[in-house]
């Protein structure tokens, strides 16, 4: 028995094999391998999975189409305004529509309404060849515009007219890649308008303007406003030294050290000594010149200022040679920023108000001549007139209002100031206040 034989090549292109089920299967000549086995029956799970995938593809395709249509064809301004107007009309009742029509006819010119209706009819003829509204005869208060059911028949606004009214430029398409520049003349007009319409914030601050001016100034111009102490020359060294007790001290000081500056004598008056002697025949012509001490008593003008150093009645106000404080000065000190100074002034004002209400100023002895006696009568009438002048001064100076503000915690934080103000108001009430109000 021969085990080895000749090797014979077979033709595989037409080779056909049969399966167990009697079906024929052909080999894949392209790859040289048999095809994968694909069973005919598919499980129910795979069928449901395929259905879900197909449904997702359909829904995603529809959404993409909707998005594409919405992005490709956006609503114009005219269309959006038209839709908004229709929504507003849908939400209105027939009575409201009639009322709005009457308001329009009463407020607008009939010629203007006729022109608007003519434009609407013109657009409606272009679409339907029939006018939407009848001709109007110009009678105010008559409406021929239909009812609420015909709001859907209203033609939309013209896109070009709306864009011109809203100053909207036409948008270029996606495929357009060219750039359009405005004319140079328009840019110049805009710049000129911007220059003429300067805002308040566009103006530079004063300090910045001064700094800019200084940058463009020469050194000679800058040194005109600047002065320095000159070096002592040999002639100045030989001059005699200045004596502060010299009556011409200010003139010599200016001549030696500041000859280039103008003389300002008024600013040096505070350096002058206070007048020591007062006129014994000093007459107080007005109650605003009366001065008081811290107890609320009157201070005569003959009292020397040297004797009041320990009591603190010397001051730097008007007439520093006179001791004490006037009501006007005390009211000014009652609004001081220093609480201690404010407390003393408020306490003094309270005592003065009490004594004015009690009429306890026995120092007020007026000189009554014949004319005064004929005009006012007795001494009591003259005294009442003087006290009335004091209360008028307090009213004009708003002393009571100032004390009320000082006693209010909303306006005054310092507790001591509030307590002194409350005490001063209490003294004012206890004294009786203005005697004229009692009558």
UniProtKB/Swiss-Prot annotation:
<protein>
    <recommendedName>
        <fullName>RNA polymerase II-associated protein RBA50</fullName>
    </recommendedName>
</protein>
<comment type="function">
    <text>Forms an interface between the RNA polymerase II enzyme and chaperone/scaffolding proteins, suggesting that it is required to connect RNA polymerase II to regulators of protein complex formation.</text>
</comment>
<comment type="similarity">
    <text>Belongs to the RPAP1 family.</text>
</comment>
<dbReference type="Pfam" id="PF08621">
    <property type="entry name" value="RPAP1_N"/>
</dbReference>
<dbReference type="InterPro" id="IPR013929">
    <property type="entry name" value="RNA_pol_II_AP1_C"/>
</dbReference>
<keyword id="KW-0804">Transcription</keyword>
<dbReference type="InterPro" id="IPR013930">
    <property type="entry name" value="RNA_pol_II_AP1_N"/>
</dbReference>
<dbReference type="InterPro" id="IPR039913">
    <property type="entry name" value="RPAP1/Rba50"/>
</dbReference>
<keyword id="KW-0963">Cytoplasm</keyword>
<dbReference type="Pfam" id="PF08620">
    <property type="entry name" value="RPAP1_C"/>
</dbReference>
<dbReference type="GO" id="GO:0006366">
    <property type="term" value="P:transcription by RNA polymerase II"/>
</dbReference>
<feature type="region of interest" description="Disordered">
    <location>
        <begin position="49"/>
        <end position="79"/>
    </location>
</feature>
<dbReference type="GO" id="GO:0005737">
    <property type="term" value="C:cytoplasm"/>
</dbReference>
<feature type="region of interest" description="Disordered">
    <location>
        <begin position="1"/>
        <end position="35"/>
    </location>
</feature>
<feature type="compositionally biased region" description="Polar residues">
    <location>
        <begin position="15"/>
        <end position="30"/>
    </location>
</feature>
<keyword id="KW-0805">Transcription regulation</keyword>
